[in-house]
């Protein structure tokens, strides 16, 4: 099938229906790259990638496939080959099979361009406050990404920082200020931020990746604002003016 999103989902659904082992998606790119090849000439095409790695890259902005299509393929154990409609090249295989995988630790690097950071200063440090803050955001379909809560020194008040899409900033500010279930001392916003992430299943069994990432950023005097980690992803929030440099450092 050609195209993205709906046609990808249709192709995977048909592959499931006929019990196919593999689904080939023809699109306008010749595979999945370690980072955006339009911005970084040294980006490398990935021959094989795990479903979970592809899910992370798709959720962070890779437009090769939609996250829902990757998830459907994973759930139905269908290997997906991404190939170009215009050139005859091998493409990228999305799979869970460990056969023929290299020992590469980091599979891909992604960054976002449309994030905003919100810090609520001096909220009450008690159970249910975070839920009270995020409930109206959820009802208004505002996606909250990175979340950090400071340790309360006095057990009375704390600060809560989280990120959202910059397009949702005004609505979020309004919802927080209208929320009668919480009280706080100050609300601060920063639209000039970008999330830079490294993704790789190999990080699960490789010590020192976090240190190396942070050391690389420190060597270029790039300050980290927020940190978020999972088994196969490490994300940092940095000033948007440092995002491209940070992404270049993580490629080393």
Region locations from a protein language model:
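C-terminal catalytic "cap/lid" subdomain
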Residues: 1-252
């Amino acid at each position: 099938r050609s195209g993205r999103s709906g046609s990808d989902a249709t192709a995977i659904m048909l592959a499931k229906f006929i019990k196919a082992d593999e689904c080939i998606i023809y699109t306008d790119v010749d595979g999945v790259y370690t980072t955006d090849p339009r911005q970084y000439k040294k980006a490398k095409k990935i021959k094989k990638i795990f479903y979970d790695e592809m899910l992370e890259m798709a959720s962070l902005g890779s437009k090769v496939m939609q996250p829902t299509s990757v998830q459907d393929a994973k759930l139905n154990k269908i290997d997906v080959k991404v190939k170009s409609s215009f050139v005859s090249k091998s493409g990228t295989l999305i799979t869970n099979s460990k056969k023929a995988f290299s020992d590469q630790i980091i599979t891909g690097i992604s960054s976002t361009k449309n994030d905003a950071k919100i810090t609520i200063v001096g909220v009450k440090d008690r159970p249910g406050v975070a839920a009270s803050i995020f409930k109206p955001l959820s009802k208004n379909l505002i996606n909250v990404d990175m979340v950090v809560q400071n340790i309360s020194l006095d057990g009375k008040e704390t600060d809560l920082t989280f990120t959202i899409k910059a397009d949702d900033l005004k609505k979020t500010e309004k919802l927080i200020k209208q929320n009668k279930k919480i009280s706080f001392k100050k609300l601060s916003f920063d639209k000039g931020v970008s999330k830079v992430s490294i993704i790789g299943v190999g990080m699960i069994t490789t010590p020192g990746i976090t240190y190396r990432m942070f050391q690389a950023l420190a060597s270029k005097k790039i300050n980290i604002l927020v940190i978020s980690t999972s088994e196969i992803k490490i994300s940092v929030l940095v000033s948007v003016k440092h995002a491209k440099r940070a992404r270049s450092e993580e490629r080393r």
